[in-house]
Amino acid sequence: MITTVQEISKWRNLCFIRMQSRKWYPVLKKTPLVADGRKIIKHADKVPHPEEIIHPFYQPTAIEQFTACATEYNPSLLDGKKIAPSLIKHPVSLKTILVDSKLKFDDIRGVNRWLMEFVARRQHQRNIVLTPASKSVRSFHVLHLSSTDIAKLRGLENILSEIENTNDLQSRVESVNNELQNIFDRDSKQTRLFCEDILAYLIKNYGNSTEKLILLINVTEMQLFSRLDQMKAMNIILYHILCKVEANENPPYSPTLVTALENLLAAINNRFFPGRCENSLHPIVIEQLLSYFIKTGNLNESKNFLGHLIKKGILPEATIINRYLEAIDVHFDKSTKIFDIRSKFAFIADLAPIIENYGTIDLFKFLIPMCRHFDELCSLLNIIRKSNNAKQAVDSTLPIFIKKVLTFTKDPMINSGNLSTVFNIVSPIYGQNVPSEFVEKFILSFALQGNYTMMAHMIDTYKIKLSHKYQLQIIRALKNSERNHALKNTGAVGYNKEFKKYFIEKYLNCTEREALRP
């Protein structure tokens, strides 16, 4: 563990903290702490505990694990780059903070056990079974009001029918509340009326305008501390409120309505729980709240309710997940900045079981741009390869994968190797008969690396027809390669002048050849 709070105080003025490893984890050296402009001390680099890493899909391959366990000095994953999103304790404030960590150890001691814990955690996420929530709404039906009961509500109906705006809302709330009290006072000895049944009836039949719905939400909040004394009752009322919100308004919702509903939720928490009420809400109501918060752009609450559904073993609807991902992209403006990617990982950390077992094409497309290392990309591609809709998913995402491969490094030989790895992963999905449209994209990507050997190999193996238009695309790619890699790998096998000459003479027409002549 890290040093005690007393020791931290002792050494803070000297601007460093002596970090000690957990149990068997590799010992870490003294690391200087640098204060930024906001006087927040930068956390010392250290390997986080596997449970602190929130990456939802990275899984080191057997080769990565073997390499890490066989490297005596500074073994690492993800090349030791600071790209593993983690929730760790700040060494001074002890608050949980979101950081990008390095998976780089000082030496080989404890690496194997660390990997075992990390892989076991990923396996646990993989084994989580989620099922869609039951769509039965029978428990939310208002069944308890007879025609005689409804006749007793005439005074409430009259008050609601007179509401046209929110200017006198508070006085109307008091009027409704007083009338409710009168109803219960008149029938105190023989009534079978319950407050939740009355409110649910009124919301269902009179909550067709924003003003009336806000009034009924405020009345519900007032009744929380008198007649609404069970969460079962609140489930019924919340269900009907959220149905009306969905039916009445398109986002953006009225700020007054948003405030009223969120005040009601806060009051429910205060009334029944010291913290949050999710554990006692019906899954359908949780899905409704999740959908509502996504539409209002409240990502923090959306994440809370989404995570709660998953922890309860419930698979949210694909449309809700897609809207959640869209809301994240809107919030971060599809940014690929380091800080924004790290924050995005925090919002999708709970999706690990869904990514592993229930991933959709839209979800995979969202995740590809978030990869900052080729090994992450391979982990995601392997998940897709094992999914039930592997072929359809690869058909839709392979061009994005190919493009993404070339963003991790400018080294043409590494890029060529990575392209070959991706090709070898997806080939079995097509029974080795990869569609020519994808093979052509690989060829153009190899052309951008100046790899004449792989271009020739793929053209021959898959019998690609080189139309005039396609030859021009190859030539443009090769010219870009010569500009970008003019001083690199010119003598390497597959990249040198002899291979270039061979490729030009065998695969390009006479008119196209001249464009590549020195």
From Swiss-Prot:
Similarity-based family: Belongs to the AEP1 family.
What is the annotated localization of this protein?
Mitochondrion
Transit peptide (first-last residue)? 1-19
GO CC entries: mitochondrion
Write down what this protein is called. Answer: ATPase expression protein 1, mitochondrial
Q: Which domain of life is it from?
A: Eukaryota
InterPro entries membership:
Aep1
Q: Which GO terms describe its molecular function?
A: translation regulator activity
Chief location bin: mitochondrion
Origin organism is Saccharomyces cerevisiae (strain JAY291) (Baker's yeast)
Query: Which UniProt key words apply to this protein?
Result: Mitochondrion, Transit peptide, Translation regulation
- UniProt function note: Required for translation of the mitochondrial OLI1 transcript encoding subunit 9 of mitochondrial ATP synthase.
